[in-house]
């Protein structure tokens, strides 16, 4: 019977060896199949899908997977909670490509998150980039993604609040407002009506930097909020809303948050003289808002591959829509989703200039870019400012609300300011 036991023993060793080899083989195949995850929201899902597919085609053997924050509020909140838990536990997606304007934000205040060790510093990677050319980008906007650790966020699209008029329709074409004080003093009805039409945007863009995130304190004071609310409500009452049905006849060319469509309209009217300007802030310049940004999760185990995706995303070939050739008559990243800046202006100044067909549009873009003195990322602070204006304006119109009583008006401002301070310190 001993020989049977011996055979069983040998068979056991052989089986164990086979299983061990099988397990090692499975582990090896798992290690080879690396998957890079890219987190997107409803505002960036289209671009994210194009980037994921294009980059994967150029890098055979490397798979990408989109982690989507859905548009539905309930589903989005559940996904955001899940992602935040993963990130805090040392995991989470490798790459973030997010719309700063999304109502459902993974990072409620991206600028604040930059100081929380969430994002990977990118300077060393950028110095060895194969495709992106940061020297061609708007340096003021790019700098907004930098902390004492280095570049941690890459702005992709930005905008400012701007207007373009047919010069011949203005009452005093030689007196175009270039400061906040001049805006409030301007008596041109055409300018007044359009500046006042979206007063909550004007209120928002009238401030420069709102906070010092490193020191975790507000830069604007409670008195600043009160003064601006009073100025904007008075301005709105001076120019009631009544957009004309025929905007061309009224002399308006374009207005709102500047993007590719804004400058296309400027191009359309380039056969005649145009007056183009950005809404000024209280710091003597122009405030830009980042509309889309990209970053790498500090927890990623694939930092080189993660940066390669950003390098692809922000390459001239992808931003321009030209794409990269691969295979037989195939192109990675060839798309019209990204350019000429739908939803914002490309951080790549060179390509943004090339997208403008007329010299008028090129000059306007260059001038407004040169006036940027503050770059903000939409946050709860912005939401408080916009809501504050709405509350003050509605109260003024009602004639018996909080705003018409000076003490109650100050209390309204004070409560908003306290909420902003709490948000900054959390």
Name each model-derived stretch.
Residues 144, 148-163, 179-224, 246-255:
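Extracytoplasmic/periplasmic solute-binding protein
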Residues 77-92, 96, 107-112, 234-265:
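Short helices/loops that flank or line small-molecule/ion binding pockets
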Residues 340-426:
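Conserved C-terminal helix/tail region of periplasmic/extracytoplasmic solute-binding proteins
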Residues 100-162, 274-279:
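Hinge/lid segment of periplasmic solute-binding proteins
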Residues 214-245, 252, 266-271, 275-279:
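Glycine-centered hinge/linker elements that transmit conformational signals in sensory
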Residues 121-135, 172, 190, 208-228, ...:
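Short, solvent-exposed loop/beta-turn-alpha elements that line the ligand-binding surface or hinge
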Residues 2-4, 8-13, 20-108, 402-426:
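Conserved N-terminal structural module of periplasmic/extracytoplasmic solute-binding proteins
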Residues 268-343:
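Extracytoplasmic/periplasmic substrate-recognition and gating elements
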